[in-house]
UniProtKB/Swiss-Prot annotation:
Record's GO cellular component terms: cytosolic large ribosomal subunit
MF terms (GO), sorted A to Z: 5S rRNA binding; structural constituent of ribosome
Family: Belongs to the universal ribosomal protein uL18 family.
Taxonomic lineage of the native organism: Bacteria, Thermotogati, Thermotogota, Thermotogae, Thermotogales
Protein name: Large ribosomal subunit protein uL18
Keywords for this protein: Ribonucleoprotein, Ribosomal protein, RNA-binding, rRNA-binding
Source organism: Thermotoga maritima (strain ATCC 43589 / DSM 3109 / JCM 10099 / NBRC 100826 / MSB8)
Length: 122
C-alpha cells in the first residue's frame, strides 16, 4: 500500500535538499525562517561555528505591543524589518536566504521583503 507523505514531511525533505547547498559563512551568514500557525521566527546563523548571531520573532516584546495578529503577512514584514535592523546593528549587511522548505510566497516573502527594506542584501 502506498502512503501519501504529509505536507510537513514534504517540507522537511525540501529543506534538507536545500540545506545541502545553502551554507552560512562569517561573511554571509544564513537568514533562516521558521513558520508556525501562530508565529513566524527568523534567525541569522553562522554555520561554520553553529551560532545564532541575531534572532527575531512575533514573540519579541517590542513586536507584541505593536501587532494585533501574529500570524499574518503584516506581522511577518515587521519581523523582517526587526531582524534587518538588529543585523545592521551587529554589522551584518549580506546574508544567504534560507526559506526553510516553504514556498517563497505570503509570510515568507513578506519577511524577506521587510529584511531587504531594512537594508539586508540577499
Amino acid at each position: 500500500m502506498i502512503k501519501k507523505e504529509s505536507k510537513k514531511e514534504q517540507r522537511l525533505r525540501r529543506h534538507r535538499r536545500v540545506r545541502k547547498k545553502v551554507f552560512g559563512t562569517p561573511e554571509r551568514p544564513r537568514l533562516c525562517v521558521f513558520r508556525s500557525n501562530k508565529h513566524i521566527y527568523a534567525q541569522i546563523i553562522d554555520d561554520t561555528i553553529g551560532h545564532t548571531l541575531v534572532s527575531a520573532s512575533t514573540l519579541d516584546p517590542e513586536l507584541r505591543e505593536k501587532l494585533q495578529k501574529t500570524w499574518n503577512v503584516e506581522a511577518a514584514k515587521e519581523v523582517g524589518l526587526l531582524i534587518g535592523k538588529r543585523a545592521l546593528e551587529k554589522g551584518i549587511k549580506k546574508v544567504v536566504f534560507d526559506r526553510g522548505g516553504y514556498k517563497y510566497h505570503g509570510r515568507v516573502k513578506a519577511l524577506a521583503d521587510g529584511a531587504r527594506e531594512a537594508g539586508l542584501e540577499f
